[in-house]
Curated annotation (Swiss-Prot):
Keyword rRNA-binding: no
GO biological processes: carnitine biosynthetic process; mitochondrion organization
Protein name: Probable oxidoreductase AIM17
Classification of source organism: Eukaryota, Fungi, Dikarya, Ascomycota, Saccharomycotina
Keywords, alphabetical: Dioxygenase, Iron, Metal-binding, Mitochondrion, Oxidoreductase, Transit peptide
A Pfam family of this chain: TauD
Organism: Saccharomyces cerevisiae (strain ATCC 204508 / S288c) (Baker's yeast)
Amino acid sequence: MLRSNLCRGSRILARLTTTPRTYTSAATAAAANRGHIIKTYFNRDSTTITFSMEESSKPVSVCFNNVFLRDASHSAKLVTTGELYHNEKLTAPQDIQISEDGKSLVVKWKDGGHHQFPLQFFIDYKGSSFVSPATRKQESRYRPQLWNKRILKDNVKDLLSVSYNEFIDPKDDSKLFQTLVNLQKFGIAFISGTPSSSSEGLTIQKICERIGPIRSTVHGEGTFDVNASQATSVNAHYANKDLPLHTDLPFLENVPGFQILQSLPATEGEDPNTRPMNYFVDAFYATRNVRESDFEAYEALQIVPVNYIYENGDKRYYQSKPLIEHHDINEDNTLLGNYEALIKCINYSPPYQAPFTFGIYDKPSDLNNNLDLNLITTPAKLTERFLFKSFIRGLNLFESHINDFNNQFRLQLPENCCVIFNNRRILHANSLTSSNQQWLKGCYFDSDTFKSKLKFLEEKFPHDK
């Protein structure tokens, strides 16, 4: 994609301040150590590299666009992609030299710029894999593990093994890494032993900022309270009745990726038995069940828009989203066994749902016998009813699954315990009533924050599984 000269400053700054990193698997790196560059030739438009990836493997050749090679370089002669497109001197090589050991080659351009490309670069970009290097940089090496109650309980020992002091220790990131890996795999993690003097939200703020900055929302600029004894219309959590399973803030275009809830100490005289029950469900597991049971209904869940609304005080938010959103399709994630690589996020929140505007019209069954009916619905809107019926069928399958006790992880969150969960994957609910005196403290942070910290720690702990 061509970028304008407006990006020149940021592009140059990035190259001056960023150390290039290689994002490769151990197997791929080992292949590079055993392979070598054999030959190369170039013209004004392209450069062809012939190399082997193993000592005894058959050599392969890849022809690269010269604009790509110059743009991917870290030459001291800094230019924008747009400049490369319009100036052949910046892209056509003047000379190319293969190193004596065959592990790299140096490209020299006509403007005096030069860059040494390691063999690993050409292996990464060889194009024989469905996963591009850019995708590999984004993806974690840990794949989501879809779960029901039994599967999660089998892993609960690891999920509950992180204490607050271990998590918050700035000299040791191992427990932070363990927590983020659990979030990546299961969408949920717990931290025990949080300090009891937390009414101001300082503890949960420290927990969040260990991962990244707190996300401001309609609930406040930092942390927020969840307490049924103080009902208010600001947050649907506060209603004095059990909430259905849902994701938070679906009426925002950029929905917060993760939520943290901390259980605070009991009030004086509180009966521990009245503490609310918390429910968690893996919505990805539920949507996979729909896909396997009724593919036509599953497709409708990807298409039919569900409307969400939030009106309170001076705030007016409105969004329309399908229940299911996918990642871009590739050769890998379309396989039935790799569904966890296909599903991106879930939009499901009955507390904030507005009336449908798609598929709401039907065709009168006796229209032919009532020709005088002045039916004003357009034919295009009438045809939506077929897809909407499939949507309702899929929604029924989805809700039957998430409301099945065997698919729910239920617990009374202990005092001074914290739960972190993926707000785009894990549905949650609680049984707060007017008799419950427990306070929950909450906050949000973004998915980008989580992904950034997880990738950094994966680099720091490359051998952890």
